[in-house]
Structures are given as structure tokens and as C-alpha cells.
């Protein structure tokens, strides 16, 4: 299986968010890609083959195909730099075109991601009540600094800003119910931002029902950022 596992957003060989990356000469079938993603078990795996002057890319979680994944694209940039040298690589996605820059600085890998177009819309009262009920929250648990919203940067996400870390620690939900709601609403991740002071407002917690995660991972918010640089590491061929 011609798959690499690469951790994006790492500091050298420490930490990061792992993704699978498959590079090939000919595209695989959907079922084959889905099986590889399920076997790897990472939240996303990127599959890329040459097309024209760039690369045709598709993303799969262990359970389904998704339209885009930022950290898997960062990992893909590192893999392309290792395989083809430093450069900017055009990427053709299911729903648009972007690029990723990959560079190998004497063994230290970096990638610069061009985000797909971003947008956001406010939640309706009915939507908000549905999500609060699912997650066991009340209106009083929400922060007044940032409105709940549906946000988009290549894929659709739900953002629920909370008033405190204590509220975040009370998070409780039924995994099957969460997966059902996300499938019905076309959501890829649910983000909760514990807005308890200025320092906390620069970080978001992301929960991924598709991978059935029992823990959460911290990421700097990049939804409304046009480009972001990230260190990556190659963990296994």
C-alpha cells in the first residue's frame, strides 16, 4: 500500500495532527480509497494523482468521502516536496482548485496551504436549539463575543463559541445521534471555542464524529485565514 502517514502542525518530530497521503500514477476506485482510509484510521487521508499540470486530489475519512481537509492537504504538500522537490503544486479538488507549497529544508518539511474560498452564515433559532440539545448545552453556556455559525472553508463546519472551559468540560453527547445530525446537515466537524479570556480566544477545539474520537485536539483557527504555514513530519512510509 503506497501510503505515507504525515503529521501536520507538528514541531519537528513532536505533536501534530496525522493524516494519510497516497500518491499514485493512476486513480484508485472509490471503494478502494475508502478501504485504505478505513484501514489507516486517521480522520482524513488524501489521495493524489497527476492531472494536467497539477494533481487531482480526493479526501476520505474512515467512513466517507469529504470535500476538503486542511491538515491532510498540508501533509500532501510535504509528501509532494519529498517526491518531486520544492515547489507550488496546483490541486484540483471535487469542488474547485487550490494550491499547496511544499519545501524540504534539509529534512525539515514545511507546507503553505492556499485555502478554498471561505464563508459563514448565522444559525437560525431552530438550528441552534437542535445543536444545543444534541450537545447538552443551554443558551447561558454560549459566549457573547462570537455568534454561533455555520462556517465553510472547503467543507462545512459548525462553530459554537462557549463561555468558559468549564462549559467545555461538561460536554456530553450521544455519538450515534451526533453522527446522524452531521450526516443530515452535511457537517464535517463541530468546533467549540472556549472564549474564557483573550488567550483562549485564539484557539479552537475540534471534535470529529466520523472518526469516533474519544479525545479532542487543539488547533489554531485557520478558517478565515487565506494561507497558513505549518511544520510537518514524516512518520512512516
Where do the PLM segments sit?
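Short, acidic/polar N-cap/turn motifs at the starts of alpha helices
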Residues: 9, 45, 88, 147-148, ...
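Short beta-strand scaffold segments in enzyme catalytic cores
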Residues: 19-22, 46-48, 98-102, 158, ...
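Short glycine/proline-enriched turns and hinge-like loops at secondary-structure junctions
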Residues: 14-17, 69-70, 200
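Fold-independent oxyanion-binding glycine-rich loops
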Residues: 6, 24-25, 51, 62, ...
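Acidic, low-complexity central loop/insert segments
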Residues: 35, 54, 60-184, 209-225, ...
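Conserved phosphate-donor
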Residues: 41-56, 177-217
